[in-house]
Amino acid sequence: MLVTLSLLSLFLCALATFLFYIGIKGKQPASVQKKAICCLAVSFILLSFLLCVSAIRDMDIYVLRSWYLIPLAWSLLLIAFIIYYKLRYTTIFVFVAPLCFILLLSALIFLHQEKPMDNLVVGPVLVVHLSLVFAGIGIMGVAAGAGCLFLWQENLLKNKTKLMNLPKNIPSLGALDKVNHIAARFGFPLYAIGLIFGFIWAYMAWGCLFSFDPKEIISLLILALYGFLFYEREVRGTNGRKTAKLALIVFAVAMFSIFVV
């Protein structure tokens, strides 16, 4: 059942990605984008059911690194829909849909190549840790998407001869910068608290808070970069290209920690 639900979600994300591309290139972007958003909504529901079933039937799966990619994709969709509900920015899904497809595809490829860890390390503290960390990374994933659109649109505006390539329904630079600001304000505290629960879980599982494991070191690096973005936005009031690039860097390091470290 879990594999079937994952495959259905994967297909819907792929279909949504295709529809968004058609919507951008076509003459009726609004109607096509609505269909794409419906596909992502169904995918989100399927992933929600998948996570609930897996939590009830087999908690061991939550300690597999490849499995992390599925709740991360779920978090990305959740954050994207929250932003869509509050700000009505449909363009943010253009980045989220293909990214979720890549995450789900990677999870399905690598899921059966890992063995679960001891049952003793699985528990509520781990669930809280993963939930908050994924929420923080998911928020930054959406901010990274907004950052890509910000830098791309700014480049087109600087080269006025390319303005014809600018889609009519893309959010303004100010709107994209606002997404970045919201991400820094709420994402950093969530990630920081999630990391604290991670160290508590490590102490409960292995008897030490910090073991200089590469995963722990890069998590602190992500926290430092995330904190720097938070400082730049909330304390110094920085905006524009710098914070857009920072969001991309934070998310890139987070993806490196998941796929490589």
Labelled PLM ranges:
Residues D58, V121-G123, L166, G207:
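Short, flexible active-site loop motifs that bind/organize anionic cofactors or intermediates
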Residues L2-E114, L132-N155, A175-A205, S211-V261:
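Hydrophobic cores of alpha-helical transmembrane segments in multi-pass integral membrane proteins
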Residues V122, L126, P171-G174, K178:
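Membrane-helix interfacial "entry" motifs
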Residues L157-G174:
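Juxtamembrane inter-helical linkers in multi-pass membrane proteins
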